[in-house]
UniProtKB/Swiss-Prot annotation:
Residues 262-275 have a biased composition (Polar residues). Disulfide bonds join C49-C91, C131-C175. It comes from Cricetulus griseus. Glycans are attached at N65, N168, N183. One of its GO terms (molecular function) is IgE binding. The gene is FCGR3A. Keywords: Cell membrane, Disulfide bond, Glycoprotein, IgE-binding protein, IgG-binding protein, Immunity, Immunoglobulin domain, Membrane, Phosphoprotein, Repeat, Signal, Transmembrane, Transmembrane helix. InterPro entries: Ig-like_dom (IPR007110), Ig-like_dom_sf (IPR036179), Ig-like_fold (IPR013783), Ig_Fc_receptor (IPR050488), Ig_sub (IPR003599), Ig_sub2 (IPR003598). Gene3D superfamilies: Immunoglobulins (2.60.40.10). Forms a heterooligomeric complex with ITAM-containing signaling subunits FCER1G. Interacts (via transmembrane domain) with signaling subunits; this interaction is a prerequisite for receptor complex expression on the cell surface and intracellular signal transduction. Binds the Fc region of antigen-complexed IgG. Receptor for the invariable Fc fragment of immunoglobulin gamma (IgG). Binds with intermediate affinity to both IgG2a and IgG2b. Can bind to IgG2a and IgG2b monomers. Does not display binding to IgG1 or IgG3. Recognizes neutralizing virus-specific IgGs displayed on the cell surface of infected cells and triggers antibody-dependent cellular cytotoxicity (ADCC). Confers protection to lethal influenza virus infection. This is Low affinity immunoglobulin gamma Fc region receptor III-A. Residues 237-275 are annotated as: Disordered.
Amino acid sequence: MSVWTSRKAAEDNDTSLSSGIRAGLQKAVVTLHPEWVRVLQDDSVTLRCQGTYPPGDNSTKWFHNGSLTLQQDANYLIGSAKVKDSGEYTCQTALSMLSDPVNLEVHIGWLLLQTTQRPVFREGDPIRLNCHSWRNTPVYKVTYLQNGKGKKYFHKNSELHIPNATQNHSGSYFCRGIIGRNNKSSETLRITVGDLTSPSTFPPWHQITFCLLIGLLFTIDTVMYFSVQKGLRRSTADYEEPEVHWSKEPENKTISEEKQSFRSSRANSETPENR
């Protein structure tokens, strides 16, 4: 076996080994601490990357909105959150694939209705809501409202737990409470509870019916158009222009009659009385 053949075989083995390792890698996982995906400005948030590291290499790649950051630790600390920190975060280790994105929202206000995930839930999922105040200022007489109606009241601020979500829990939520002597309310958060399975590759029946109707109307219109065109061509082919025969007899007859009348008038004018 030649040196080139041996080298080529070794390279192929390395490539196969690398491909096999990449195929066997698991995704890294990003978690939030605290768990809330919605926070207020100046809150402290820690993102943790859970993945596999090779011996002696604990470096981590962090991406914010797709751009590589300077952070290389497994823990990504945001000491005082700002609006610019909002967005998607992903991480990757040497022996882990790129994680799924985790979305962080940073808001400005006195109160914020917090959730532990984006506000779309499956039926049966638990839902946790928290009426969070800026810089953890004490809040009293807290009311959680759904579609403008009071759902739960707490004299002292507490989380609202929905153990098994149903479609009846879908709607617009917000919270309000007393901070100092002032009544404050959070922004409205739309929560959806439903079937999150992959949608069918077939369009809904009403879309199918609409498309069939449009196709039928187009076909009828096309047939009528060509029928009319064919009828017009046939009518044109069957039409014969009538022959026109011109005769000079009436004209000649008129001229002769005028000559005869002129002669008669002349003869009458030459009477003896006029001579």
